[in-house]
């Protein structure tokens, strides 16, 4: 377990120890990281990241912040809207997304929320990637042989797109 991410994601009381700024920065890092991995592996196109959320009031805020970070970094954000964690895992795997994000605090009180990260296989994100995110949230991450205090923004036609992907959710539910 890290400073922010516990056994099942980054959880906390909305706008107290889990803020809109945290969500934006998680989106910024993931959008850049997966776009950079694709580029370094000779794969064309933007990173593709799928997002779902539960019905908590703060889930909408966190969704918009995550999406803002993702597209600012050049990733395409696919929105499943209100859905379940298993549906995000399923769609991340079968539709070959770079990763998935679920905004939910499961059984915790309504004022809490969380950001769960899912890899391309539909499983919990690996600890190494989570440690990169935590280091970025703390102000500096060492990755690809460099130290990053801020990751680059995408420009012009490299800015990511948002995609309404309710059809993906409907295939699962």
Residue ranges and their predicted role:
Residues 13, 113-173:
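Gly/Ser/Thr-enriched, mixed-charge loops and adjacent short helices
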Residues 20-25, 66-68, 95, 118, ...:
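Hydrophobic alpha-helical segments
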Residues 39-121:
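Ferredoxin-reductase
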Residues 32-33, 77-80, 106, 127-132, ...:
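Short, surface-exposed, polar/charged, turn-prone segments marking secondary-structure boundaries
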């Amino acid at each position: 377990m890290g400073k922010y991410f516990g056994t099942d994601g980054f959880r906390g009381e909305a706008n107290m120890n889990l803020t809109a700024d945290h969500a934006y920065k998680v989106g910024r890092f993931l959008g850049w990281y997966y776009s950079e991995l694709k580029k370094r592996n000779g794969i064309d196109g933007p990173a593709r990241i799928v997002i779902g959320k539960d019905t908590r009031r703060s889930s909408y805020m966190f969704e918009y912040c995550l999406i803002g970070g993702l597209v600012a970094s050049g990733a395409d954000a696919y929105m499943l809207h209100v859905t379940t964690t298993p549906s995000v895992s399923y769609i991340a795997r079968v539709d070959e997304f770079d990763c998935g994000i679920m905004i939910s605090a499961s059984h915790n009180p309504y004022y809490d929320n969380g950001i769960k990260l899912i890899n391309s296989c539909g499983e919990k994100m690996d600890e190494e990637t989570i440690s990169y995110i935590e280091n970025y949230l703390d102000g500096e991450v060492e990755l690809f042989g460099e130290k990053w205090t801020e990751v680059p923004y995408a420009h012009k036609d490299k800015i990511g797109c948002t995609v309404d992907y309710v059809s993906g959710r409907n295939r699962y539910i």
